[in-house]
Amino acid sequence: MKCGSELVEGKRWASVVFTHDYSDWSTMEDVSQTGAVWWRVVRTKDSIEAQCSKDGEKFTTIRQGYFPADVKVMAGVMCAAPEGAGFDAKFDQLTLKTA
């Protein structure tokens, strides 16, 4: 699973992709078009849930999906530009932590 903000046709979207034999992409209008966005992933038994927030307090669920209970969850950051000339990215005040 990967989750984050995606720029599609000039608009920012909250994006979650699950891959288990095939990929399943879910999007919704991002919680903030210009400001900071917090992401949280919650694991419960054999599923994970991707949530985002514009204030780090109130989170909205974007997608929940199957994730085998015996598989370790790993987290990291990335940027990608599958089309065009690319872009500059800045991660500011980045924190990765477990609950």
Where are these regions (language model features)?
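Extracellular glycan-recognition regions
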Residues: M1-A99
